[in-house]
Amino acid sequence: MDIDQYMTDLGRRARHASRAMARASTAAKNAALDAVARAIERDAQALKDANARDVARAREKGLDAAFIDRLTLSDNALKTMVEGLRQVASLADPIGEIGNLKYRPSGIQVGQMRVPLGVIGIIYESRPNVTIDAAALCLKSGNATILRGGSEALESNAALAKLIGEGLEAAGLPQDAVQVVATADRAAVGKLITMTDYVDVIVPRGGKSLIERLINEARVPMIKHLDGICHVYVDDRADLAKALTVCDNAKTHRYGTCNTMETLLVASGIAATLLPPLGKLYRDKQVELRVDAAARAVLAEAGVGPLVDATDEDWHTEYLAPVLAIKVVDGLDAAIEHINHYGSHHTDAIVTEDHDRAMRFLREVDSASVMVNASTRFADGFEFGLGAEIGISNDKLHARGPVGLEGLTSLKYVVLGHGEGRQ
């Protein structure tokens, strides 16, 4: 296969389809989503058979249990896909909305209209459910998309792509609006991320090594985040019960997510009260604690252990594991300075009953999501009321934070006049 020609052809077809998608009616887009949902229900066994072949090959390669779990399309996974498609269909269609419409002294009206981005390239790893999630959001937001899934899920993704194409055709929409790259050749990724004539934005969903490669090689703009080094700062005016709940949930609800707390900052004035019960809670849940000298002194006196001395590298690390770095700080200023220096601009939280300190934290912490008295685990499109998300961005331009339908659109100015000319 000539990868360069193959990818160029996908791009050309996607660009053509994007024009039809931009003018597609809400009814047609919703009909396509419903048709795909019904096709998944109808062909569930065929999907599971294709997926079983992918899973068997993954096991032959010796891939670990966690990877196999992400790859597997269980009955519950298929049900979740169907529910997700219908949920996206139920969301308000942002395309064509005109906001901020106002008259100018010249007599013209000026507003902003929400429009699709165009063609979105999505690169992801082992989860075949992303094929459906990404296709649904791109379809509803009026975009065409090129999906490049993981090589281990080729048969699963091909089977899902067939059903998506059927759904688009049934609704009178171009099948080329959703295309799945049908090769495991890594050169396909290299071509996709440089096709500036055909692709408007790349959304990567994967591990750090993938994102780093794309940052270095991509010429197409990206919506991305590299790390999720999330912090909780417990202020000396915090409510102890709230602090225990937030700190427990932020770390132990799930260890492998990008919105999990990786560093706990504790004000020196509350350390002796908070750390002993919190340390015992983490110990009971087998969380390894990497601590500075001040935190060690408090925890050791309370009989909490074992403890590991933190190094500077710990403040930079996204563990994605039952490991937590703990540092005692002088107060709010030191906490904000630490977060802005070591953090990844993803999600950070303060626990405090002091309104002024809470507002300072919200203003001064330079992150995509900043929270007061709430777990960092809430940084999620569904929890934020977006309905669904295609990913999370910690960049400052275009989309920031969880990216839902509106994040896959942009605004253009529209002017309504009555024959006016500029004086």
Curated annotation (Swiss-Prot):
Keyword flag NADP: yes
Catalytic activity: L-glutamate 5-semialdehyde + phosphate + NADP(+) = L-glutamyl 5-phosphate + NADPH + H(+)
Source domain of life: Bacteria
InterPro entries, per database record: Ald_DH/histidinol_DH (IPR016161), Ald_DH_C (IPR016163), Ald_DH_N (IPR016162), Aldehyde_DH_dom (IPR015590), G-glutamylP_reductase_CS (IPR020593), Glu-5-SA_DH (IPR012134), GPR_dom (IPR000965)
Pathway recorded for this protein: Amino-acid biosynthesis; L-proline biosynthesis; L-glutamate 5-semialdehyde from L-glutamate: step 2/2
Assigned GO CC terms: cytoplasm
Catalytic EC class: oxidoreductase
Molecular function terms from GO: glutamate-5-semialdehyde dehydrogenase activity; NADP binding
Annotated EC: 1.2.1.41
CDD domains according to UniProt: ALDH_F18-19_ProA-GPR
Entry keyword set: Amino-acid biosynthesis, Cytoplasm, NADP, Oxidoreductase, Proline biosynthesis
GO biological process, alphabetically ordered: L-proline biosynthetic process
Compartments where located: Cytoplasm
Role this protein plays: Catalyzes the NADPH-dependent reduction of L-glutamate 5-phosphate into L-glutamate 5-semialdehyde and phosphate. The product spontaneously undergoes cyclization to form 1-pyrroline-5-carboxylate.
PANTHER family reported for this sequence: DELTA-1-PYRROLINE-5-CARBOXYLATE SYNTHASE, GLUTAMATE SEMIALDEHYDE DEHYDROGENASE
Family: Belongs to the gamma-glutamyl phosphate reductase family.
Protein name, entry field: Gamma-glutamyl phosphate reductase
Species of origin: Burkholderia ambifaria (strain ATCC BAA-244 / DSM 16087 / CCUG 44356 / LMG 19182 / AMMD) (Burkholderia cepacia (strain AMMD))
